[in-house]
């Protein structure tokens, strides 16, 4: 004000704006009133239909960030105005801001002008009240208890309110919080994926990743290594890998599991770097001109350029798309019985696979999510248009990029929800597999003892030596390849059990000529006895499992990943999906999605890592 009285010429105080800054006026208050009026150029559309209003949470973040900037004292604005914005926040009154219409170059001019519009009592100003009611500026001030009434803006105060990056950076900060959570979640569920796929934990070995040097990769591997260390699933998997090792691949499949630390590592680094950049931005002074009181000087610069936002958000979106791509690859292997090490096709949990297609619809949905996510990975910042009479010829598009990244985060939440339910389904199927396989082994063993041990005259029969090899067949055969009809001669179990008896009969030599010592003669009796007892025993074991009376407890309880499983199953009340139940997969996905959106997944996620000290397991 003193500078104006002395005749000092200052941008936005005595001049017009942007390309019309050659105009001059001494009516500073009227100038800023006009600034707010012409910047109110956004479109909201019809209530509830077109969705052109910025989310209230993003608006509130913008208000908070703008207060933080203005409090630093370089913007030329009264403290009372900041107190008024604070009162609106504290009373949960949120001005309505247009979703679109800013290029985040001379700041987020258009959306921020609607906050200024409420402070100055513009008749078109609207706000949201917590009960959903839309209120005008007068009602907002009354409910917020702001006694001073609407503000008559003094010179520079209009610019101080609108000429900043708060909307883009506020939304970016919210997006990055969720992106960081989802990146950690992707690391943990990659480890769970290894558990249910009976993978080899060697891919997390510290030395492998130390030799690559990249910190994100080292962290991802260390988290997975921590989750898998001591895992009950890994102990079982080790025994399985030791069976006929020369008949199996030496290493796990290339991408979805074995390369997950190398894939996730760079994405983690990108998200961390973006977080640091946005942290700097929300704590910066980002308007123009800046008032240096100590030197009694107005500094004309361009801190309102939101390039850190646009670039950080573009990079984050690319990282999110990469995480989603890995998640889709893992999910595709999980539901495919050619790759999932014995789990049923589509993770079908019912008795009849012809009437249970499990997660087939979910895989189609995941493909759609992933495709949209890959499209969103395209950059925004290379679509700059020269604006405002070519005055803003390069601009950041920060809020646009933030909005698109928010969309990408939502899609990754959809994918994470679907995958998490799929992993819990796989965990329960492994539990079912272990219990039913134990039942099959016991039944085969008992039938072998009854039928193969004793001959017709009570003597020991040569077929008694078959039992051990029969049990080996059960151990080596994937349960879900036959369990819907365990005694079917078209399924591998009965075929291979018969093959064992035939091979022993061939070894039996001359004894096969005597019916009392012939193993061939025992095959029919063995199969008939098995057909009499095995289906009943399997069904009985399944019923007991469904009642919660499993003979073998669920291994997940002995794993560090258990808190996440427990959260999905117990707190969110989801359960094994089958074609025999009315409940659809989407109903379960919705529960998990809502929990992720509400931040409820954070505590169980951190509980999985509670014992982790932030470092890889030492090399011994």
From Swiss-Prot:
Localization, UniProt: Cytoplasm
Enzyme Commission no: 4.3.1.24
CDD domains: PAL-HAL (cd00332)
Keywords recorded for this protein, A-Z: Cytoplasm, Lyase, Phenylalanine catabolism, Phenylpropanoid metabolism
Biological processes, Gene Ontology terms: cinnamic acid biosynthetic process; L-phenylalanine catabolic process
Catalytic activity: L-phenylalanine = (E)-cinnamate + NH4(+)
InterPro entries: Aromatic_Lyase (IPR001106), Fumarase/histidase_N (IPR024083), L-Aspartase-like (IPR008948), Phe/His_NH3-lyase_AS (IPR022313), Phe_NH3-lyase (IPR005922), Phe_NH3-lyase_shielding_dom_sf (IPR023144)
PROSITE patterns with a match to the protein in the record: PAL_HISTIDASE (PS00488)
PTM statement from Swiss-Prot or TrEMBL: Contains an active site 4-methylidene-imidazol-5-one (MIO), which is formed autocatalytically by cyclization and dehydration of residues Ala-Ser-Gly.
UniProt function note: This is a key enzyme of plant metabolism catalyzing the first reaction in the biosynthesis from L-phenylalanine of a wide variety of natural products based on the phenylpropane skeleton.
Protein's name in the database: Phenylalanine ammonia-lyase
Organism per entry: Persea americana
Lineage, opening ranks: Eukaryota, Viridiplantae, Streptophyta, Embryophyta, Tracheophyta
């Amino acid at each position: 004000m003193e500078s104006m009285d002395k005749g000092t010429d200052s941008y936005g105080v005595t001049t017009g704006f942007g390309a019309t800054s050659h105009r001059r006026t001494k009516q500073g208050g009227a100038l800023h009133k006009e600034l707010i009026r012409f910047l109110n150029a956004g479109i909201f559309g019809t209530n509830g239909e077109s969705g052109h209003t910025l989310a209230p949470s993003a608006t509130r973040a913008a208000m908070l960030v703008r207060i933080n900037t203005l409090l630093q004292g370089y913007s030329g604005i009264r403290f009372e105005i900041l107190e008024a914005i604070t009162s609106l926040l504290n009373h949960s009154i949120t001005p309505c801001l247009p979703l679109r219409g800013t290029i985040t170059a001379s700041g987020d001019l258009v959306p921020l002008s609607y906050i200024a519009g409420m402070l100055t009592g513009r008749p078109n100003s609207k706000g949201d009240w917590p009960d959903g009611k839309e209120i005008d500026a007068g009602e907002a001030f009354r409910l917020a208890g702001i006694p001073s009434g609407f503000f008559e803006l003094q010179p520079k105060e209009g610019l101080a309110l609108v000429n900043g990056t708060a909307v883009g950076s506020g939304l970016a900060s919210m997006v990055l919080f969720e992106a960081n959570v989802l990146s950690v979640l992707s690391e943990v569920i990659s480890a769970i994926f290894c558990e249910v796929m009976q993978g080899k934990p060697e891919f997390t070995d510290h030395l492998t990743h130390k030799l690559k040097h990249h910190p994100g990769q080292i962290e991802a591997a260390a988290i997975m290594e921590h989750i898998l260390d001591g895992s009950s699933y890994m102990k079982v998997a080790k025994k399985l890998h030791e069976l006929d090792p020369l008949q199996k691949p030496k290493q796990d499949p290339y991408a979805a599991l074995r390369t997950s630390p190398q894939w996730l590592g760079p994405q983690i680094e990108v998200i961390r770097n973006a977080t640091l950049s946005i942290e700097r931005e929300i704590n910066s002074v980002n308007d123009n001109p800046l008032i240096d009181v100590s030197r009694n000087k107005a500094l004309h610069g361009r801190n309102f350029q939101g390039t850190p936002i646009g670039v950080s958000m573009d990079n984050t979106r690319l990282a999110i798309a990469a995480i989603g791509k890995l998640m889709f690859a893992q999910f595709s292997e999980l539901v495919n019985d050619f790759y999932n090490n014995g789990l049923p096709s589509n993770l079908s949990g019912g008795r009849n696979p012809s009437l249970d297609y499990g997660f087939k619809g979910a895989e189609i949905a995941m493909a759609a999510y992933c495709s949209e996510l890959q499209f969103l990975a395209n950059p925004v910042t290379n679509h700059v248009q020269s604006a405002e009479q070519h005055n803003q010829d390069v601009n950041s598009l920060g809020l646009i990029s933030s909005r698109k990244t928010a969309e990408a985060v939502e899609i990754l939440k959809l994918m994470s929800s679907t995958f998490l339910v799929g992993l819990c389904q796989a965990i329960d199927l492994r539990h079912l597999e272990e219990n039913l396989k134990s039942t099959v082994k016991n039944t085969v063993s008992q039938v072998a003892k009854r039928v193969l041990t004793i001959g017709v005259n009570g003597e020991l029969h040569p077929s008694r030596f078959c039992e051990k090899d029969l049990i080996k067949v059960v151990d080596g055969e994937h349960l879900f390849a036959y369990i819907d009809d365990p005694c079917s001669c078209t399924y591998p179990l009965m075929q291979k059990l018969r093959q064992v008896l035939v091979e022993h009969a061939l070894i039996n030599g001359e004894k096969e000529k005597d019916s009392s010592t012939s193993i061939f003669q025992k095959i029919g009796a063995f199969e008939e006895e098995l057909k009499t007892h095995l289906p009943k025993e399997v069904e009985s074991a399944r019923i007991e499992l469904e009642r919660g009376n499993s003979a073998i407890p669920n291994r997940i309880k002995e794993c560090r990943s258990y808190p996440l499983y427990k959260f999905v199953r117990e707190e969110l009340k989801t359960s094994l999906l089958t074609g025999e139940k009315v409940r659809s997969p989407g109903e379960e996905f919705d529960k998990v999605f809502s929990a992720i959106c509400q931040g409820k997944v954070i505590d169980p996620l951190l509980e999985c890592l509670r014992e982790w000290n932030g470092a890889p397991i030492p090399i011994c």
